[in-house]
Amino acid sequence: MKNNLNQLIDIFENQIPANKMIGMKVDQISVGKVKVHVPYQEMFIGDYRQGFWHGGILASIADAAGGLAGFTTLTSPEDKINTIDMRIDYLAPAVKSDIFVEVNLIKVGKRILNADVVLYQKDIHNPVAVARCAYSALRN
């Protein structure tokens, strides 16, 4: 799918129901690198007393964005990516504001891809969460 990044954006934003429901938008995409943002919605609140984002929503965003970065390395429409492992560290509360995500693939092997994912709100140097994701690549 390296050759058609615009098609990947459409699939990611419009054809994956969970991504569409969350409202994920691709800001930048290149092979192995992705920037995504998610506009804040009231339904994302997990701690209603303090108004913080639900950690599960943040994990879903990290996983989806990391998978998109993995898809940028594939060459055939029949190739597939599956999450095999993910670790997320929550570093600060995510408040009632948009979430921004930057993903960098750190290793692209024949069968395994590894991604570093940073989720932040105002400043990438002050992240709300970081994740390390591993994906299996099923290449045809």
What are these regions (language model features)?
Residues G55-S76:
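Active-site helix/loop of acyl-thioester processing domains in fatty-acid/polyketide metabolism
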Residues G56-I57, A64, D85-Y90, V117-L119, ...:
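Hydrophobic alpha-helical segments of small multi-pass membrane proteins
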Residues A69-F100, L105:
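Hydrophobic beta-strand-centered segment that forms part of the acyl-chain substrate-binding groove
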Residues M1-A18:
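Extreme N-terminal tail/first-helix region
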Residues N3, A94-K96, F100-E102, I106-N140:
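HotDog/MaoC-like acyl-thioester-processing domains
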Residues I22, G32-V34, N82-M86, S97, ...:
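A generic structural signal for short beta-strands and their flanking turns/coil linkers
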Residues G23-F52:
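Catalytic strand-loop segment that frames the active site of acyl-thioester-processing enzymes
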